[in-house]
Structures are given as C-alpha cells and as structure tokens.
Amino acid sequence: MGQKVNPVGLRVGVIRDWESRWFAEKDYATLLHEDIKIREYITARLKDSSVSKVEIERAANRVNVTIHTAKPGMVIGKGGTEVEALRKALNQLTGKRVHINILEVKKADLDAKLVAENIARQLENRVSFRRAQKQVIQRAMRAGAKGIKTQVSGRLGGADIARAESYSEGTVPLHTLRADIDYATAEADTTYGKLGVKVWIYRGEVLPSKKKASEEGGK
C-alpha cells in the first residue's frame, strides 16, 4: 500500500522554509528540546487564540519567536499585557532573552492547522463529523483554495469499530513539489475516545523562477 509522506516536510527547502532557523554544533539536542518546550507552552497557553504556527530564530543568547495567529488582538491583550506576560514566562522557561513578534493569518480558512483545529472543536461539541468536514471544505473553496481534502478517523458517531472517512473537493497534487500544499493534524477528545483529524489544502502553485526574478529586480 502506498504511504503518504508529510507534504510540508517534503517541500521544506524547495518552496517552504524551516520553522526553526538556527545553527548549533554541540548544543543541538538541548536547543531542539527547548524549541519543543517553547512550542508546547505557547500552544497550551494560547489554545483559544487560533495559533497556526510558531517560528523560532536564535542569535547568541537571544531567541526570536514569531507567532502566526488569526486572532492577534487576543494574543497581544489590552495594552500589550498578554504578550508581555508571555514574554516573561518564556524568559523564565528558557533562561534567555526572548523577543516575540506577532503576525496575523489573513485567511484562516486557507490555513490547514486552523481548519483542522476547527473540525476538532466541532467534533468535541458533538457536531456530526460529516457536517463539520463539508462545512470547512465549502469555506476553504470560497476563500480561494484550489483544492482541499479532510479526513476524520476513530470511533465515528460512537461506533464500536474505528474507521476513517474523508471528503475532498478540487485537486490536491501531493506529488507536485511546486504545489503549495498546507497539511496539519489535530485531535478531538470525545466521550467515545480520541478522533484524529487531517487536513490538506492546495493553495496554488509557487513558481520559484518568478520569485527569484522579482527578488533580483528589486535589488
């Protein structure tokens, strides 16, 4: 049986950039675990703030954290109180100077992580898995997606035997490396156990030649 590689990992270095950007020789493992801790802390603390991804850059004893979120107001807080509290907590967690940038995700319906989390939350609120999937597919296509595929697996509707059901619309060319495909997973805790959610969103092709040409033209 053909297995699917993670579409994001497959495209790193081709059309996508790394989410952790730093270099280390001796402390690689320590810093990697620190990255994982930072991400886990941020996602747990901001679980209601629609956080899509967390990018980390390092320089000497300084850590730059960029949070991509659909609700920047919630992350920043009134007069920047929330983001300041988060920065202090991360300073304590890492023992380093942490600087936080916040970027807004303009189209939440085209972000696989936010779509997957949305389906998971609906499943936890006892919405039918079919309805939840069809609803996000419609919204993604309206928002300008070229294609989308969603899958929910587990004890669907409380069935005794676990299974997976998926729905798709448009095209999702997983083999085309220049295709900008966003992929993410989420989990829903229901009374019958956990349900797994997977989302693939095809947002169009990225043409590296055009990108390079525009960069050279801008110099």
UniProtKB/Swiss-Prot annotation:
CDD domains: KH-II_30S_S3 (cd02412)
SUPFAM superfamilies (alphabetical): Prokaryotic type KH domain (KH-domain type II) (SSF54814), Ribosomal protein S3 C-terminal domain (SSF54821)
Protein's UniProt name: Small ribosomal subunit protein uS3
GO CC, one annotated term: cytosolic small ribosomal subunit
Family: Belongs to the universal ribosomal protein uS3 family.
Gene: rpsC
UniProt cross-references to SMART domains, sorted A to Z: KH (SM00322)
PROSITE patterns per record: KH_TYPE_2, RIBOSOMAL_S3
Molecular function terms from GO: mRNA binding; rRNA binding; structural constituent of ribosome
UniProt KW keywords: Ribonucleoprotein, Ribosomal protein, RNA-binding, rRNA-binding
Species per Swiss-Prot/TrEMBL record: Bacillus cytotoxicus (strain DSM 22905 / CIP 110041 / 391-98 / NVH 391-98)
Transmembrane segments: none
Domain KH type-2: 38-106
Any one of the GO BP annotations: translation
Subunit note: Part of the 30S ribosomal subunit. Forms a tight complex with proteins S10 and S14.
Function description: Binds the lower part of the 30S subunit head. Binds mRNA in the 70S ribosome, positioning it for translation.
Keyword Iron-sulfur found: no
